[in-house]
Protein backbone atom coordinates (compact mmCIF):
# COMPACT_ATOMS: atom_id res chain seq x y z
CA UNK A 1 0.00 0.00 0.00
CA UNK A 2 1.30 3.45 -0.92
CA UNK A 3 1.89 6.01 1.79
CA UNK A 4 -1.13 7.92 3.00
CA UNK A 5 -0.66 11.03 5.07
CA UNK A 6 -2.63 14.03 6.25
CA UNK A 7 -1.20 17.50 6.51
CA UNK A 8 -3.18 19.67 8.93
CA UNK A 9 -2.43 23.38 8.61
CA UNK A 10 -3.38 25.62 11.50
CA UNK A 11 -2.57 28.94 13.13
CA UNK A 12 -1.92 29.77 16.75
CA UNK A 13 -4.65 32.45 16.66
CA UNK A 14 -7.32 30.15 15.18
CA UNK A 15 -9.75 28.88 17.79
CA UNK A 16 -11.44 26.51 15.35
CA UNK A 17 -8.04 25.01 14.48
CA UNK A 18 -7.40 24.18 18.12
CA UNK A 19 -10.90 22.75 18.57
CA UNK A 20 -10.61 20.44 15.54
CA UNK A 21 -7.00 19.31 15.91
CA UNK A 22 -7.62 16.69 18.65
CA UNK A 23 -10.39 15.13 16.57
CA UNK A 24 -8.21 15.06 13.44
CA UNK A 25 -5.43 13.46 15.51
CA UNK A 26 -7.85 10.86 16.90
CA UNK A 27 -9.28 9.88 13.51
CA UNK A 28 -5.91 9.64 11.75
CA UNK A 29 -4.52 7.56 14.62
CA UNK A 30 -7.52 5.19 14.49
CA UNK A 31 -7.01 4.76 10.74
CA UNK A 32 -3.25 4.27 11.08
CA UNK A 33 -2.53 7.30 8.89
CA UNK A 34 0.42 9.63 9.41
CA UNK A 35 -0.43 13.19 10.46
CA UNK A 36 1.76 16.26 10.14
CA UNK A 37 0.55 19.44 11.89
CA UNK A 38 2.00 22.67 10.52
CA UNK A 39 1.56 26.14 11.97
CA UNK A 40 1.25 28.51 9.00
CA UNK A 41 2.18 31.52 11.14
CA UNK A 42 5.56 29.97 11.85
CA UNK A 43 5.90 28.44 8.36
CA UNK A 44 4.20 30.76 5.82
CA UNK A 45 6.16 29.14 2.99
CA UNK A 46 4.20 25.92 3.57
CA UNK A 47 0.90 27.79 3.29
CA UNK A 48 2.13 29.21 0.01
CA UNK A 49 3.32 25.81 -1.23
CA UNK A 50 -0.13 24.27 -0.66
CA UNK A 51 -2.02 27.42 -1.73
CA UNK A 52 -3.69 27.79 1.66
CA UNK A 53 -5.60 31.03 2.16
CA UNK A 54 -7.56 30.09 5.28
CA UNK A 55 -7.15 27.70 8.19
CA UNK A 56 -7.74 25.06 9.33
CA UNK A 57 -6.98 22.92 6.28
CA UNK A 58 -6.73 19.13 6.17
CA UNK A 59 -5.08 17.73 3.05
CA UNK A 60 -5.07 13.97 2.42
CA UNK A 61 -2.25 12.59 0.27
CA UNK A 62 -1.94 9.19 -1.37
CA UNK A 63 1.69 8.86 -2.31
CA UNK A 64 2.81 12.30 -3.43
CA UNK A 65 -0.57 13.28 -4.87
CA UNK A 66 -3.25 15.31 -3.18
CA UNK A 67 -6.31 13.11 -2.81
CA UNK A 68 -8.72 15.30 -0.81
CA UNK A 69 -8.82 18.69 0.89
CA UNK A 70 -11.13 20.43 3.33
CA UNK A 71 -10.71 23.98 4.51
CA UNK A 72 -12.25 26.28 7.10
CA UNK A 73 -15.16 24.15 8.33
CA UNK A 74 -13.95 20.56 8.30
CA UNK A 75 -16.77 18.02 8.19
CA UNK A 76 -15.37 15.20 10.32
CA UNK A 77 -17.79 12.61 8.93
CA UNK A 78 -16.67 13.48 5.40
CA UNK A 79 -13.03 13.52 6.55
CA UNK A 80 -13.36 9.96 7.85
CA UNK A 81 -14.90 8.87 4.53
CA UNK A 82 -12.08 10.57 2.64
CA UNK A 83 -9.52 8.63 4.68
CA UNK A 84 -11.33 5.36 3.95
CA UNK A 85 -11.44 6.21 0.24
CA UNK A 86 -7.74 7.11 0.28
CA UNK A 87 -6.95 3.72 1.81
CA UNK A 88 -8.98 1.99 -0.91
CA UNK A 89 -7.23 3.96 -3.66
CA UNK A 90 -3.82 3.26 -2.13
CA UNK A 91 -4.49 -0.46 -2.45
CA UNK A 92 -5.23 -0.21 -6.16
CA UNK A 93 -2.19 -1.34 -8.13
CA UNK A 94 -2.77 1.07 -10.99
CA UNK A 95 -3.21 4.21 -8.87
CA UNK A 96 -0.30 6.52 -9.76
CA UNK A 97 1.98 7.61 -6.93
Show the residue positions of the predicted features.
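Structural micro-motif
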Residues: 50-59
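CheY-like receiver
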Residues: 46-50, 82
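Local sequence-structure signature of Cys/Sec-based thiol-disulfide redox active-site neighborhoods
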Residues: 1-26, 30
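Conserved strand-loop elements at the edges of beta-sheets that form or border functional pockets
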Residues: 40, 52, 72
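Thiol-based oxidoreductase modules, predominantly thioredoxin-like and allied folds used
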Residues: 9, 32-46
